[in-house]
Amino acid sequence: MKKVMTATEIMEMIPNRYPICYIDYVDEIIPNEKIIATKNVTINEEFFQGHFPGNPTMPGVLIIEALAQVGSILILKMDQFEGETAYIGGINKAKFRQKVVPGDVLKLHFEIVKLRDFVGIGKATAYVEDKKVCECELTFIVGR
């Protein structure tokens, strides 16, 4: 599949940088509706040093952070939010269904459910090999 956005283009849109930029590329964008992106999880991730020795597992909160970053890209692609920053305003209904480990390819899906002025809600889901590993509802706030 052809990349819609590269890591360099992603870093031009969102402020996250190493070691907390969790998107390798964007696979698909339907403007104002949904986005799918990829994170290749490798043993070289800093968080694996302590989470957990001998049983490396990606922390659930970092999966949610990756989903929020993907949502930020979709939101900031909207004309009215160009040049702004999207922040997490809330996390609801978070569920973790299986662990994410080195070698996994994390597919990150975000769909806008509701948007009013500078506040919105998105449905966020992460998959590994078509298996749902995490889902949540993210409230976002756009500002400077």
From Swiss-Prot:
It is found in: Cytoplasm. SUPFAM superfamilies: Thioesterase/thiol ester dehydrase-isomerase. It catalyses: a (3R)-hydroxyacyl-[ACP] = a (2E)-enoyl-[ACP] + H2O. The active site is at H51. GO terms for biological process: fatty acid biosynthetic process; lipid A biosynthetic process. It comes from the Bacteria. Keywords: Cytoplasm, Lipid A biosynthesis, Lipid biosynthesis, Lipid metabolism, Lyase. Gene3D superfamilies: Hotdog Thioesterase (3.10.129.10). It is an enzyme of class 4 (lyase). Its main location: cytoplasm. The keyword Lyase applies. One of its GO terms (cellular component) is membrane. One of its GO terms (molecular function) is (3R)-hydroxyacyl-[acyl-carrier-protein] dehydratase activity. Its EC number is 4.2.1.59. PANTHER family: 3-HYDROXYACYL-[ACYL-CARRIER-PROTEIN] DEHYDRATASE. Involved in unsaturated fatty acids biosynthesis. Catalyzes the dehydration of short chain beta-hydroxyacyl-ACPs and long chain saturated and unsaturated beta-hydroxyacyl-ACPs. Belongs to the thioester dehydratase family. FabZ subfamily. This is 3-hydroxyacyl-[acyl-carrier-protein] dehydratase FabZ.
